């Protein structure tokens, strides 16, 4: 699942390119996670537009709607409902140790919301609600899948075998794409000059690579 954006080029290399190769081997679900996106302030109309555009970009990159289930997260209320239940089986300390939370909290100390803190619980719900066996992720998301397994095991220990325990599926190539501006950091939309968007103009792409 990918949050709606202008279409990060690293998302294509790190995820979508690998997803296209998976669609003939597995039963796949691809989700535009617009609920995750609102952990930072969003313009509602713009978020809706970007969500639909992102689905269109998925299809343009080779994901076949006839072979995959493709949808927008907020259109399926069970994601939010299960997230609340799973949150009741998640420890505060587990969430406070999440590397991405610590990184984002350090960068945005004036806007540390409960939504940002519980982001991994909603991600766990995204996975467990579909009884997924494998979760295609980059290396930076492996910790979230491991937390998802821990939550599922804890829930299963109380109520019996309810959830499938997922495994991270990390591609050998493109598991972590680095910033054009800072090769020690992951490429991120928070640094527009350090990343390439799929919808960038050719001259903008060349400018970014020449400055790298």
Language-model-detected regions and their locations in the chain:
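Active-site cores that bind ATP or allylic diphosphates and position pyrophosphate for catalysis
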Residues: 102-212
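Single conserved hydrophobic/aromatic residue that forms the stacking wall/gate
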Residues: 1-8, 12
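A glycine-rich helix N-cap at a beta->alpha junction
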Residues: 50-70
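Short, glycine/charge-rich beta-strand/loop segments that flank catalytic centers
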Residues: 66-80, 99-109
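Glycine-rich loop at the start of a catalytic domain that most often binds anionic cofactors/ligands
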Residues: 38-55, 81-89
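Short, conserved active-site loops that position catalytic residues or coordinate cofactors/metal ions
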Residues: 28-41
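Acidic, His- and aromatic-enriched active-site or binding-groove loops in soluble protein domains
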Residues: 90-101
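Histidine-anchored nucleotide/phosphate-binding helix
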Residues: 13-29
């Amino acid at each position: 699942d990918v949050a709606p954006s202008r279409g990060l080029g690293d998302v294509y290399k790190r995820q979508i390119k690998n997803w296209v190769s998976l669609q003939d081997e597995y039963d796949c679900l691809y989700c535009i996670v617009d609920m995750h996106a609102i952990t930072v302030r969003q313009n509602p109309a713009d978020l809706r537009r970007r969500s639909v555009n992102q689905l269109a970009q998925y299809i343009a990159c080779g994901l076949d709607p006839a072979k995959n289930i493709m949808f927008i997260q907020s259109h399926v209320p069970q994601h939010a409902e299960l997230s609340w239940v799973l949150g009741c089986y998640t420890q505060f300390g587990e969430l406070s140790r999440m590397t991405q939370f610590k990184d984002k909290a350090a960068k945005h100390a004036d806007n540390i919301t409960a939504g940002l803190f519980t982001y991994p619980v909603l991600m766990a719900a995204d996975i467990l609600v579909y009884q997924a066996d494998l979760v295609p992720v980059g290396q930076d998301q492996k910790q979230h899948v491991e937390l998802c397994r821990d939550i599922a095991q804890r829930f299963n220990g109380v109520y019996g075998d309810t959830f499938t325990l997922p495994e991270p599926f990390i591609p050998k190539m493109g598991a972590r794409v680095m910033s054009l501006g800072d090769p020690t950091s992951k490429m991120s939309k928070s640094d527009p000059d350090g990343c390439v968007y799929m919808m960038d103009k050719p001259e903008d792409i060349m400018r970014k690579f020449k400055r790298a």
